[in-house]
From Swiss-Prot:
This protein is one of the early assembly proteins of the 50S ribosomal subunit, although it is not seen to bind rRNA by itself. It is important during the early stages of 50S assembly. It comes from Mycoplasma capricolum subsp. capricolum (strain California kid / ATCC 27343 / NCTC 10154). The lineage of its organism: Bacteria, Bacillati, Mycoplasmatota, Mollicutes, Mycoplasmataceae. It comes from the Bacteria. Keywords: Ribonucleoprotein, Ribosomal protein. Part of the 50S ribosomal subunit. The gene is rplM. One of its GO terms (biological process) is translation. One of its GO terms (cellular component) is cytosolic large ribosomal subunit. This is Large ribosomal subunit protein uL13. One of its GO terms (molecular function) is mRNA binding. Coiled coil: none annotated. Belongs to the universal ribosomal protein uL13 family.
Length: 151
Protein backbone atom coordinates (compact mmCIF):
# COMPACT_ATOMS: atom_id res chain seq x y z
CA UNK A 1 0.00 0.00 0.00
CA UNK A 2 1.38 3.41 -0.98
CA UNK A 3 1.80 6.12 1.57
CA UNK A 4 1.06 9.76 0.85
CA UNK A 5 4.30 11.62 0.39
CA UNK A 6 4.70 14.84 2.31
CA UNK A 7 7.29 17.37 1.28
CA UNK A 8 9.47 19.13 3.80
CA UNK A 9 10.98 22.59 3.72
CA UNK A 10 14.47 21.24 2.99
CA UNK A 11 13.33 19.43 -0.19
CA UNK A 12 11.86 22.48 -1.92
CA UNK A 13 13.45 23.84 -5.09
CA UNK A 14 12.09 27.28 -5.86
CA UNK A 15 11.99 28.38 -9.48
CA UNK A 16 12.02 31.93 -10.79
CA UNK A 17 9.40 33.10 -13.28
CA UNK A 18 9.10 36.36 -15.18
CA UNK A 19 5.78 37.87 -16.30
CA UNK A 20 5.29 40.77 -18.70
CA UNK A 21 2.27 42.80 -17.52
CA UNK A 22 1.96 44.80 -20.74
CA UNK A 23 -1.69 44.83 -21.93
CA UNK A 24 -2.70 42.30 -19.26
CA UNK A 25 -5.79 42.83 -17.11
CA UNK A 26 -4.78 43.47 -13.49
CA UNK A 27 -7.22 41.00 -11.91
CA UNK A 28 -6.46 38.07 -14.22
CA UNK A 29 -2.74 38.69 -13.88
CA UNK A 30 -2.98 38.91 -10.08
CA UNK A 31 -4.91 35.64 -9.67
CA UNK A 32 -2.47 33.62 -11.75
CA UNK A 33 0.60 35.17 -10.11
CA UNK A 34 -0.89 34.49 -6.66
CA UNK A 35 -1.33 30.80 -7.58
CA UNK A 36 2.36 30.54 -8.49
CA UNK A 37 3.43 32.38 -5.32
CA UNK A 38 1.40 29.93 -3.21
CA UNK A 39 2.68 26.88 -5.09
CA UNK A 40 -0.77 25.64 -6.09
CA UNK A 41 0.44 25.03 -9.63
CA UNK A 42 2.70 22.23 -8.38
CA UNK A 43 1.75 18.59 -8.04
CA UNK A 44 3.17 18.40 -4.51
CA UNK A 45 1.28 21.41 -3.10
CA UNK A 46 1.11 21.21 0.67
CA UNK A 47 -0.98 23.85 2.50
CA UNK A 48 1.29 24.17 5.55
CA UNK A 49 4.58 24.41 3.61
CA UNK A 50 5.63 27.46 1.60
CA UNK A 51 6.63 25.78 -1.67
CA UNK A 52 5.71 28.65 -3.99
CA UNK A 53 8.07 30.10 -6.55
CA UNK A 54 9.51 33.59 -7.09
CA UNK A 55 7.72 35.79 -9.63
CA UNK A 56 9.17 38.87 -11.34
CA UNK A 57 6.58 41.18 -12.91
CA UNK A 58 7.90 43.72 -15.42
CA UNK A 59 6.16 46.62 -17.20
CA UNK A 60 3.80 47.15 -14.26
CA UNK A 61 2.83 50.60 -15.55
CA UNK A 62 1.35 49.03 -18.71
CA UNK A 63 -1.15 46.72 -16.95
CA UNK A 64 -4.75 47.63 -17.78
CA UNK A 65 -8.12 47.70 -16.08
CA UNK A 66 -11.36 46.74 -17.81
CA UNK A 67 -14.26 49.15 -18.01
CA UNK A 68 -14.08 52.54 -16.31
CA UNK A 69 -12.03 51.38 -13.32
CA UNK A 70 -9.17 53.72 -14.22
CA UNK A 71 -11.26 56.66 -13.00
CA UNK A 72 -13.97 54.99 -10.87
CA UNK A 73 -11.88 52.64 -8.71
CA UNK A 74 -10.36 54.09 -5.54
CA UNK A 75 -7.78 52.89 -3.03
CA UNK A 76 -8.62 53.81 0.56
CA UNK A 77 -6.52 54.00 3.70
CA UNK A 78 -7.04 55.62 7.08
CA UNK A 79 -4.54 57.36 9.35
CA UNK A 80 -6.60 56.36 12.43
CA UNK A 81 -7.13 60.01 13.31
CA UNK A 82 -10.52 61.74 13.05
CA UNK A 83 -11.11 62.75 9.44
CA UNK A 84 -8.11 60.70 8.34
CA UNK A 85 -9.73 58.73 5.50
CA UNK A 86 -7.64 59.10 2.36
CA UNK A 87 -8.62 57.95 -1.09
CA UNK A 88 -6.72 57.82 -4.34
CA UNK A 89 -7.95 56.85 -7.81
CA UNK A 90 -6.15 54.32 -9.98
CA UNK A 91 -5.04 57.02 -12.41
CA UNK A 92 -3.44 59.06 -9.60
CA UNK A 93 -1.79 55.94 -8.15
CA UNK A 94 -0.44 55.04 -11.60
CA UNK A 95 1.28 58.45 -11.78
CA UNK A 96 2.78 58.16 -8.28
CA UNK A 97 3.87 54.49 -8.20
CA UNK A 98 2.38 52.02 -10.70
CA UNK A 99 4.03 49.02 -9.03
CA UNK A 100 1.80 49.44 -5.95
CA UNK A 101 -1.31 48.67 -8.05
CA UNK A 102 -0.15 45.16 -8.88
CA UNK A 103 1.49 44.58 -5.50
CA UNK A 104 -1.74 45.36 -3.68
CA UNK A 105 -3.91 43.28 -6.03
CA UNK A 106 -1.64 40.25 -5.60
CA UNK A 107 -1.10 40.70 -1.86
CA UNK A 108 -4.85 40.70 -1.19
CA UNK A 109 -5.16 37.35 -3.01
CA UNK A 110 -2.65 35.67 -0.69
CA UNK A 111 -3.48 34.25 2.76
CA UNK A 112 -3.67 36.78 5.59
CA UNK A 113 -1.19 35.05 7.89
CA UNK A 114 2.56 34.51 8.35
CA UNK A 115 2.75 32.13 5.42
CA UNK A 116 1.04 34.70 3.18
CA UNK A 117 3.58 37.36 4.12
CA UNK A 118 6.43 34.94 3.38
CA UNK A 119 4.90 34.18 -0.01
CA UNK A 120 4.49 37.90 -0.69
CA UNK A 121 8.24 38.37 -0.24
CA UNK A 122 8.78 36.21 -3.34
CA UNK A 123 6.99 38.81 -5.50
CA UNK A 124 9.16 41.34 -7.34
CA UNK A 125 7.33 44.05 -9.33
CA UNK A 126 9.18 46.54 -11.54
CA UNK A 127 8.30 49.55 -13.61
CA UNK A 128 9.82 49.08 -17.05
CA UNK A 129 11.47 45.99 -18.47
CA UNK A 130 14.73 46.11 -16.48
CA UNK A 131 15.19 43.99 -13.35
CA UNK A 132 18.21 42.95 -11.24
CA UNK A 133 17.40 39.20 -11.20
CA UNK A 134 18.92 38.08 -14.50
CA UNK A 135 21.39 35.84 -12.62
CA UNK A 136 18.48 33.63 -11.45
CA UNK A 137 17.64 32.81 -15.11
CA UNK A 138 13.87 33.25 -14.78
CA UNK A 139 11.55 31.27 -17.05
CA UNK A 140 8.80 33.11 -18.94
CA UNK A 141 5.39 32.46 -17.38
CA UNK A 142 2.56 32.74 -19.89
CA UNK A 143 -0.51 34.45 -18.45
CA UNK A 144 -3.81 33.79 -20.17
CA UNK A 145 -5.74 36.87 -21.25
CA UNK A 146 -9.18 35.33 -21.70
CA UNK A 147 -11.57 33.75 -19.25
CA UNK A 148 -11.21 29.98 -19.28
CA UNK A 149 -7.99 30.10 -21.30
CA UNK A 150 -5.56 28.27 -19.01
CA UNK A 151 -2.02 27.59 -20.22
Amino acid sequence: MKQTTMISAKNINKKWYIVDAENKTVGRLATQVALVLRGKHKVDFTPHINNGDHVIVINAEKAIFSGKKESNKFYYHHSMHPGGLKKRSVSVQRELDPTKILERAIRLMLPKNVQGSNQYRALHVFKGSEHPYAAQKPEVLEISTKKGDVK
